[in-house]
């Protein structure tokens, strides 16, 4: 049974859509058909109000009434069509147009015929009684004209009490009247009167608001003029009486002049006095008053600003000098440390005239001493190639009588290129040990070198050949391999130290230092003489500093 109800409802919906889309049934007619359908519930109140509103139009009124008369002709099982049509007619008598009421009265005979409507359902229930009762009530109402007027007046009163919007967006109001048309017209007139009254009230409110706003503006203008007058009056009074301004009074005047500008921003009217009073507020408290008599006080007031600007310039210049402070401090330390080393040279070598270099080299290595010390026990003298004037330590004392007046760039000038460029930038800390090295230079080494040199190079070709290693004069090479070749330096005796020094000398040549060949005999004699002098020297500090210098050059040889 439920399936049949669902099926019937679906069929009705399809039929309705076909009527609207295919058959082009008018919308109002379709609304009347929906209000008088075969559903087990009555028509909706909104649909009834729309139908009653449509009866006020002639064309739609005829359309609505034709559908209702068609529904009243139904019989039998379609009793719901008849019953719902009678419900719509009852609503139109109270709320419909006069035209609709007149047409309903004309069809009183058709409605009275429904008082004998009969239909009994299969279950034995008499459902025709609903139609009969409804038809009897409508016929009784139609026969009483006064009753119709009373019902219509009551409906109008209800509409005035409850105002709503229809589907077309029109507000419905009505007043009490004898006829429906009169009530509708009176309702519209009442609506117009309400509208006029509201518009007048709004206009009065707007005018009162404008008046109050103009009053506020007038008060604001008077306040602004009073403020500006008091400001100018106070200025004239200060110029005439005291002649000396204080910063507090100047700040007070600036605040007073700035106050009207903040108040004028809240309003839109133009005030020329307000704008003129805004201009002095842009200046500072230290501005010079051109109309005042005391200009000296103004200049005194403006003094701190000038000093602050000069201080800013001085700070800027100090910042520029501070950018180079790192370089200046380094050179000052080098010079100061060089002066200290010069005093040490005077203490240890006072018998010999020396020339010291006071200026520091541009490249100073402050951490080179930690790498140069190898071992304090290995006492190795300085090779001749390292003692050439090309690598003079800038902090060391150089003897004036070097090489006995001979040419310092003599026979072994070609070997000066054998020394690597590593020690040419000596460390500042290591220069203290180099100051004692001229003791071994000036005593024995230069004289014995010139006396015992068996071979003098007279030709530049021979010197170039010797420097390049094209001619090998080293016939007596050492036959024993030393541990220094491998890089092992330990606790060596005096004889082992000689071998280690020779090995370090040749290791420097093998690594590309280019120290030259054929110097083994010369180097050994030089080493023996230096060892004898060191043994004969009674001064302990001399032996200590010479050993430190030898250690430094030994480490330089290993680095090469």
Curated annotation (Swiss-Prot):
Residues 221-233, 274-287, 414-439, 544-554 have a biased composition (Polar residues). Residues 190-288, 414-453, 517-560 are annotated as: Disordered. GO terms for molecular function: clathrin binding; protease binding. Residues 526-536 have a biased composition (Low complexity). Residues 193-220, 234-251 have a biased composition (Basic and acidic residues). Keywords: Cytoplasm, Cytoplasmic vesicle, Cytoskeleton, Golgi apparatus, Protein transport, Transport. Residues 20-152 form the ENTH domain. A motif (Clathrin binding) lies at residues 296-300. GO terms for biological process: protein localization to plasma membrane; protein targeting to vacuole. A motif (ALPHA-ADR binding) lies at residues 320-322. Mostly expressed in cotyledons and flowers, and, to a lower extent, in roots, leaves and siliques (at protein level). It is found in: Golgi apparatus; Prevacuolar compartment; Cytoplasm; Cytoplasmic vesicle, Clathrin-coated vesicle. Interacts with clathrin, VTI11, GAMMA-ADR and VSR1. Binds to the deubiquitinating enzyme AMSH3. PANTHER family: CLATHRIN INTERACTOR 1, EPSIN/ENT-RELATED. May have a role in transport via clathrin-coated vesicles from the trans-Golgi network to endosomes. Stimulates clathrin assembly. Does not seem to bind to phospholipids. Plays an important role in the vacuolar trafficking of soluble cargo proteins at the trans-Golgi network. This is Clathrin interactor EPSIN 1. The gene is EPSIN1.
